[in-house]
Amino acid sequence: MTPEWEAAAKNGDVAALSSMLEAGTDPNARDSHGQTALMLAAHAGHGEVVRALINAGADPDRSAKFGLTATMLAVVSGHEAIATMLAEAGANLLAKGSGAPGFAGKTAADLARDRGLERLSAVLDPSSTAA
């Protein structure tokens, strides 16, 4: 992942990101921590960038260190609309974190529940009738 690509994702610069995608940048490129632009944008709360990356083929199921996915990062950052967007885009809602305290063995729905986000937890729980 180039510094420009990382900055566009972190800063919500959808125009720069779109330009780089058109130039052939891999939407699933990873930074030195194994995070993709989708993870960075989801964590930072940049919904327009998340949507552009999904439309460009970014994989919502990629995980970084400790098994954290873009959906999990959106949840722990309190970005409910982005977590919902990722779920609607087909993110694996059964993926579980591994190793990190507070994340090990937990799904995005578990993380939402831990943070008191009951409505979001229901949306992210495949066994819920609200999903």
Model feature map: region roles:
Residues S32-H33, K65-F66, G99-A100, A104:
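Ankyrin repeat start-site detector
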Residues L93-T129:
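Leucine-rich solenoid repeat scaffolds
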